């Protein structure tokens, strides 16, 4: 039976709900996990037959949305090889989606429901990927990662070899090493080195078959800084498209499966469409902690007794800008996916979820924190953010 959602509240205009069946990133990751752990399994997304010793490359281009591919990417090699449109998970963000692509479980289970999460054991609002408090020091605690992220990576105890091709600046971070258990880590610097590392790892797996999990973050970084339809993002896409062609040529005749997908897409947000919670404002005094989650889908923890005042504020100040949903209703909706929930999930959702309308963001401020201005954003439920391509080439 396919997982179903139970939405008992209004949704932002144009919402695309996450698909936790065969038409979403979770289904792709879950089936990949099964293939890695069963020598006799087939893997339909990669056209891998049962028992076949295939070399599979899963190339994740951070931020490459399906809507972008359909417009800016029209006529590209990547566009021509697209097989399917998938949904991201909720929230449509790297911390949630890439962790799903490394574990094979949805955000409800792995527990990373945004760039920032709330976990009082480690100081309140924290960023789990860099393992920092929000505008605070690096996290240090006994058995930090096993407690924070107890779900094992899909590579752990896999019966097929796995090589992770990862940017050198994050390849051996604490978060990366924790989620790479069972795999070989191959760091790279720059796009040319990225391609060379992928080919070298494919050569290493030629006899045994296995997975090359390759991650490229630059498109995402440029889209945040310059906008998702900027010239800079377009140039980066063109370079990735050329890499896709080069990989097919370098691996020609070997029936390597090259799959390309993304963790999420992008939308641009103007500064004039930002709900800015000023320090010491009426609503700031209702909050028991800084916002967490994403600026396109935020979670908030209220002070005890502030619920009625917050709802009254939201009814006026968020009208046409966001949908405020109680934490209980958001959890029950299934938007974070099926499965046994992470033991801290209820805390990580907070008192309310704020689902931003198209083009809107919400931010707050922490003393000493440097504001990060972003033109391109993601995390929300719009089609631009939620839809990602599944691209396949067989060499």
Question: How should these model regions be labeled?
Answer:
Residues 54-57, 208-218, 256-258, 352-354:
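Generic beta-sheet signal
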């Amino acid at each position: 039976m396919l997982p179903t959602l139970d939405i008992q509240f209004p949704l932002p205009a144009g919402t695309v709900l996450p698909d936790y069946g065969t038409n979403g990133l979770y289904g792709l990751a879950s089936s990949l996990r099964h293939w890695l752990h069963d020598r006799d399994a087939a893997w339909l997304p990669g056209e891998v037959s049962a028992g076949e010793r295939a070399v599979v490359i899963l190339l994740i281009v951070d931020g490459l949305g399906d809507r972008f591919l359909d417009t800016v990417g029209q006529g590209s090699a990547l566009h021509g090889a697209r097989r399917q449109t998938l949904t991201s998970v909720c929230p449509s963000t790297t911390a949630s989606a890439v962790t799903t692509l490394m574990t094979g479980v949805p955000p409800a289970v792995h527990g990373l429901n945004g760039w920032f999460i709330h976990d009082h054991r480690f100081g309140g609002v924290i960023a789990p990927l860099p393992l920092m408090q929000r505008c605070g020091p690096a996290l240090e605690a006994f058995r930090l990662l096993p407690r924070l992220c107890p779900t094992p990576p899909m590579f752990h105890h896999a019966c097929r070899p796995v090589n992770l091709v990862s940017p050198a600046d994050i390849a051996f971070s604490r978060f990366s090493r924790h989620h790479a258990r069972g795999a070989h880590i191959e760091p790279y610097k720059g796009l040319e080195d990225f391609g060379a590392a992928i080919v070298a790892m494919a050569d290493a797996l030629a006899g045994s078959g296995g997975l090359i999990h390759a991650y490229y973050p630059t498109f995402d970084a440029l889209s945040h800084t310059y906008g998702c339809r900027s010239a800079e993002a377009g140039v980066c896409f063109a370079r990735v498209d050329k890499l896709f062609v080069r990989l097919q040529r370098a691996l020609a005749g070997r029936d390597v499966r090259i799959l390309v997908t993304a963790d999420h897409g992008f939308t641009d947000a103007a500064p004039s469409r930002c709900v800015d919670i000023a320090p010491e404002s009426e609503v700031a005094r209702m909050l028991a902690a800084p916002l967490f989650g994403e600026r396109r889908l935020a979670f908030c923890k209220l002070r005890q007794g502030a619920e009625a005042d917050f709802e009254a504020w939201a009814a006026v100040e968020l009208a046409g800008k966001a949908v405020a949903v109680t934490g209980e209703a958001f959890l029950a909706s299934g938007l974070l996916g099926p499965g046994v929930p992470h033991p801290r999930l209820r805390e990580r959702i907070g008192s309310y979820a704020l689902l931003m309308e198209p083009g809107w963001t919400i931010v707050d401020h922490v003393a000493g924190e440097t504001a990060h201005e972003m033109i391109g954003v993601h995390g929300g439920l719009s089609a631009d953010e939620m839809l990602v391509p599944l691209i396949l080439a067989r060499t």
